[in-house]
Amino acid sequence: MFSMVTEFMNYGQQTVRAARYIGQGFMITLSHANRLPVTIQYPYEKLITSERFRGRIHFEFDKCIACEVCVRVCPIDLPVVDWKLEMDIRKKRLLNYSIDFGICIFCGNCVEYCPTNCLSMTEEYELSTYDRHELNYNQIALGRLPMAVIDDYTTRTILNLPEIKNA
């Protein structure tokens, strides 16, 4: 008889302990219910990047001296620099510059070590395409100015908003 009483007491203690654990889990769930969502509705709302964000590389053709420092500091030897030596002025003349963003790891070494600051990181992060060969950007595509995150053509088109005028 005494064993039945102790088993009944143990059952009661286990029931109280289980109810306490369920209550703790429920309180954690309720505390998360009052928080703001972390995600954004991507095509309609754009992510505002931080100041040190490393996006697409912007290239200024006129500043480049074809020194190939960017190729030497790149961990994967990615930038392709084609140049020709001008014998009359004894300087290199840049013919072609390209970066394949399908392979680029966006480490920023090329931007950091460029002696003429012809390379810079932009806030542009939408580089997705259906064909991986479209990710190979030449100097014309690299020289294109980045589109502002706030004034995006696709968002304006989807939401039928007027174009933002720069003052």
Curated annotation (Swiss-Prot):
Cofactor note: Binds 2 [4Fe-4S] clusters per subunit.
GO MF assignments: 4 iron, 4 sulfur cluster binding; iron ion binding; NADH dehydrogenase (ubiquinone) activity; quinone binding
Xref: PANTHER family: NAD(P)H-QUINONE OXIDOREDUCTASE SUBUNIT I, CHLOROPLASTIC
Family affiliation: Belongs to the complex I 23 kDa subunit family.
Localization in the cell: Plastid, Chloroplast thylakoid membrane
Keyword Zinc (UniProt): no
Binding-site list for [4Fe-4S] cluster 1: C64, C67, C70, C114
InterPro entries with a match to the protein in the record: 4Fe4S_Fe-S-bd (IPR017896), 4Fe4S_Fe_S_CS (IPR017900), NADH_quinone_OxRdtase_chainI (IPR010226), NDHI (IPR004497)
Pfam families listed in its UniProt record: Fer4_10
Matches recorded under Gene3D superfamilies: 3.30.70.3270
Entry protein name: NAD(P)H-quinone oxidoreductase subunit I, chloroplastic
Oligomeric and partner information: NDH is composed of at least 16 different subunits, 5 of which are encoded in the nucleus.
Cystine residue pairs: none
Catalysis: reaction(s): a plastoquinone + NADH + (n+1) H(+)(in) = a plastoquinol + NAD(+) + n H(+)(out); a plastoquinone + NADPH + (n+1) H(+)(in) = a plastoquinol + NADP(+) + n H(+)(out)
Function: NDH shuttles electrons from NAD(P)H:plastoquinone, via FMN and iron-sulfur (Fe-S) centers, to quinones in the photosynthetic chain and possibly in a chloroplast respiratory chain. The immediate electron acceptor for the enzyme in this species is believed to be plastoquinone. Couples the redox reaction to proton translocation, and thus conserves the redox energy in a proton gradient.
Biological processes, Gene Ontology terms: photosynthesis, light reaction
Binding site for [4Fe-4S] cluster 2: C74, C104, C107, C110
Organism: Panax ginseng (Korean ginseng)
Top-level taxonomic group: Eukaryota
Entry's Gene Ontology cellular component terms: chloroplast thylakoid membrane
